[in-house]
Amino acid sequence: MKVLGLDVGDKKIGVALSDELGLTAQGLTVIYRTSLKKDLEEIKKIIDLHHVTEVVIGYPRNMNGTAGPRAELVKRFARELYKFTGIKPVFWDERLSTVEAEKLLISGDISRRKRKKVIDKLAATLILSGYLNYKSKN
């Protein structure tokens, strides 16, 4: 059972994948967004290639727990992904995932240019990792 983690942004979608047992998350790729149809096709290819059975999408919340300004866009994307793949995505609180990813990359002394290339993939990995940890305890 592999789980796909997505960090959906305006320009890029960070993608992470779990191992077969659903215990660990690894960054997989970054999809540079062009159109909804092409984005969905790219994700579907990944789902089919890796035999993904579950999809987790980072859900943008404000620090007080309310839905963030991008929440409706992410919900709309999730609905379209469900229609396209038949897999109903699970939402996972992504508060501070990008901030945490940035801190990890800075602490690893990664240059700003390199950080821009991998931050979305790392954010997706953190989202997926949080979800997998939760599932393993419940």
From Swiss-Prot:
The keyword Nucleotide-binding does not apply. GO terms for biological process: rRNA 5'-end processing. It holds the Pfam family RuvX. The keyword Repeat does not apply. Its EC number is 3.1.-.-. InterPro entries: RNaseH-like_sf (IPR012337), YqgF (IPR005227), YqgF/RNaseH-like_dom (IPR006641), YqgF/RNaseH-like_dom_sf (IPR037027). GO terms for cellular component: cytosol. Its main location: cytoplasm. It is an enzyme of class 3 (hydrolase). It comes from the Bacteria. It is found in: Cytoplasm. Could be a nuclease involved in processing of the 5'-end of pre-16S rRNA. This is Putative pre-16S rRNA nuclease. It comes from Carboxydothermus hydrogenoformans (strain ATCC BAA-161 / DSM 6008 / Z-2901).
